[in-house]
């Protein structure tokens, strides 16, 4: 049911419509701010101005508008970053398990990536002192959103975690312990090695691996800033493996898979995404990976 704006909001909206018709865009912007101050949002559409109640939390226009704290020193030990693309119950399950099992100094950051249905749950979960929230209006691709989370972080260790990954014990502490070795740049739950002439990957680990999957992947924040996630990767699939090789190519350290107590629930990114988009973007990423790394045997691990 559409909520009817109160008379003061409607009056400002009518004035804004007139200002836009007169091409007085400065007045239009000023009136939009006045409408927002009354708790309503004014959005322009092909059918005219649309008024909707604003949510009880700030919403950035896009991930480019999120705070950039990349120049700040480390201020905490670890952040677990969750990219929320919907499925609020999955988000709740993942976060509640983190709060139960992860070390008490680990902070959880949720990025509501332009979702129509998960923002309120993200806001509710952020009432917990260890949970922080970010909301954007326009959804971003996987790597773009993930790198924005890295830039907004101030932890020494940044953990990429998919909401389908659910802790059944402390799955974060062992990753942090692995990163105490200065020769290790990243630690994760699932590792893989190249097989079949670089045309496929096979499960590997525990121990040193050629690539880590992004279901649960801890990396030093400094490394994630120095070697960003592949910017052309709009979809998650294969982008984590491409990034793994980029980190190792840069000589920033080794990657290790660690046996941790987690389970994977339904992976929405794969099973519930548009299959045409999924296959197209996955192939583009893997083709880019092959073009850069195929034949680079110095990046292979002896088995």
What positions do the PLM features span?
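C-terminal, non-catalytic tails of nucleotide-sugar-dependent glycosyltransferases
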Residues: 63-75, 185-188, 193, 206-207, ...
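A conserved acidic beta->alpha catalytic loop
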Residues: 112-121
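Glycine-rich, basic loop-to-helix element that forms the pyrophosphate-binding segment
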Residues: 136-153
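Short beta-strand-to-loop acidic/aromatic patch adjacent to the donor-nucleotide binding site
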Residues: 155-166
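Conserved donor NDP-sugar-binding/catalytic core segment of glycosyltransferases
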Residues: 169-200
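A recurrent flexible, glycine/aromatic-enriched loop bordering the glycosyltransferase active site
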Residues: 200-222, 236
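Donor nucleotide-sugar recognition loop
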Residues: 214, 226-256, 260-262
């Amino acid at each position: 049911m559409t909520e009817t704006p109160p008379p003061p909001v409607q009056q400002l909206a009518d004035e804004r419509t007139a200002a836009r018709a007169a091409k007085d865009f400065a007045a239009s912007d000023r009136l939009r701010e006045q409408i927002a101050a009354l708790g309503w949002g004014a959005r322009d559409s092909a059918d005219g101005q649309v008024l909707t109640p604003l949510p009880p939390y700030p919403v950035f226009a896009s991930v480019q508008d999120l705070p950039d704290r990349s120049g700040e020193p480390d201020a905490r030990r670890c952040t677990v970053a969750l990219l929320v693309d919907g499925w609020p119950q999955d988000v709740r399950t993942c976060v509640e398990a983190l709060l139960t099992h992860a070390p008490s100094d680990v902070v959880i950051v949720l990025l509501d990536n332009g979702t129509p249905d998960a923002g309120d749950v993200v806001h509710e979960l952020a009432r917990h002192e260890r949970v922080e929230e970010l909301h954007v209006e326009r959804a971003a691709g996987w790597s773009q959103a993930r790198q924005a989370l890295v830039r907004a972080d101030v932890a020494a260790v940044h953990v990429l975690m998919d909401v389908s990954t659910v802790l059944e014990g402390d799955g974060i502490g062992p990753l942090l312990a692995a990163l105490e070795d200065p020769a290790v740049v990243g630690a994760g739950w699932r590792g893989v090695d190249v097989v079949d002439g670089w045309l496929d990957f096979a499960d590997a680990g525990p121990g040193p691996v050629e690539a880590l999957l992004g279901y649960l992947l801890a990396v030093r924040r400094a490394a994630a800033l120095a070697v960003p996630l592949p910017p052309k990767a709009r979809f998650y699939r294969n982008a984590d493996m491409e990034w793994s090789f980029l980190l190792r190519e840069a000589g920033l350290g080794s990657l290790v898979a660690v046996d941790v107590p987690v389970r994977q629930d339904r992976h929405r990114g794969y099973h519930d995404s548009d299959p045409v988009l999924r296959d197209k973007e996955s192939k583009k990423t893997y083709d880019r990976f092959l073009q850069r790394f195929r034949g680079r045997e110095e990046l292979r691990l002896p088995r």
